[in-house]
Amino acid sequence: MSVERVRNYLKQFGADGRIIEFELSSATVDLAARAAGVDAARIAKTLSFDGDSDCILIVAAGDARIDNAAFKARFGRKARMLTPERALEMTGYAVGGVCPFDMSDNVEVWLDESLKRFGTVLPACGSSNSAIELSCEELETFSRARGWVDVCKNWRETYPCIIDMHAHLFPEMLVEHAMDRLTKVSDGLKPVITPTYAETVKYMKNHAISAFASLPIATKPSQCTSINNYAAKVNSDYVLAFGTIHPDFPEPLKELERVKELGLHGIKLHPDHQQILPDDERMFSLYEKMAELDLPVVLHAGWDPVSPDYTRCTPERLRHIIDRVPGLTLIGAHMGGVKMSDDVMKYLVGQNVYFDTSMGYRYLTPERMLELIRAHGTDKILFGSDCPWGPLDAQIQRLREIGLSDDELEMIFHKNAEKLLRL
């Protein structure tokens, strides 16, 4: 089998055990993306062309298309793709499994610039149901590529800037304890990474995320100062750190002023973890201060597995806040309310509140998610993943597949966040 040929070849790099074999077909970019559970753009497709040395292989991102003019300018010949029979003869791999590994000297392997957006990509491994996840540096080494070329188009337009407005990271000294506790009440969700600063930044960059918001939660009043200090430490153009507050913190209004002075981008509250009601009377002085300081607040909205029998932050309670503090910039996480889309429609759609998309892929049908987005307005929707709990690829792909226009996707993926945070 051709996959065994690749496996034997990759032994020299110690990578033979990293080959993934799928039960489903991965013969096309879309099929490979579904089988691997990644965005189609991260599939590294191998295209075969006639060349001076008998064959030129271009390894490009899944959303890229050959630019005939650029190809001719680079190689001095037209981009004529090989027939399936000729591709098999030259590479030893059938169409659907063509890959850049273990090529003879008369086959030139070139890597296209479209791949460099991603920390890791997935080329085939010789069969129509296989792949391997490699960094671009590994792909260059393992394929013995002759270099990088810029001979593709379309990808710059189809893969927009993405700002993830809902992610979490933890100091290394706390992450193990925190994740152990949270995993026990995660509704069966498994973290996609261990959310340290380094791992989260690496994961985001691997998925071509342009920036992400880090949302901390003070479950006890005593945690506010240290959490906000840590947020200030990691805050950057790439990590858009928010702060947090607890209503029982001594002089919480002064701490909100300090959050603003630290340059943090907003406040995160999680009523279930903090065991507070979002529309408790003592919260309104905090909301008014946030509005005064122009600090957006992200509220976990709807059901949460940490409190499965009592939902503290319902869409109706969020509406009380909207009505009482109209100057507050409020973000209702999880499309306004996990498992409460009927109440979201009743109380929140069309109101002065943003929704983020985190966990929508898990708790909403594609049709219901599109209905909510269109009813509320795409100018008030922010992309969010809830990393480390939500896989980025699945959530990006869901938004691309539900029927939104390119302009709507751009608004959700980055333009709304840029406007909201004045980036």
PLM segments and residue spans:
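Extended, low-hydrophobicity, polar/charged segments
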Residues: 1-157
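Mid-to-C-terminal alpha-helical segments outside catalytic/metal-binding sites
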Residues: 157-168, 174-211, 375-380, 393-423
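Active-site neighborhood of phospho(di)ester-bond hydrolases with catalytic His/Asp-centered motifs
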Residues: 162-165, 213-215, 242-243, 268, ...
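Conserved, mostly hydrophobic/aromatic
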Residues: 166, 204, 231, 259, ...
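Histidine-centered divalent metal-coordination motifs
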Residues: 166-172, 300, 334
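Active-site gating/metal-coordination segments in enzymes
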Residues: 210-211, 219-305, 309-312, 363
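Catalytic pocket-lining loop regions of alpha/beta-barrel enzymes
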Residues: 265-266, 279-382
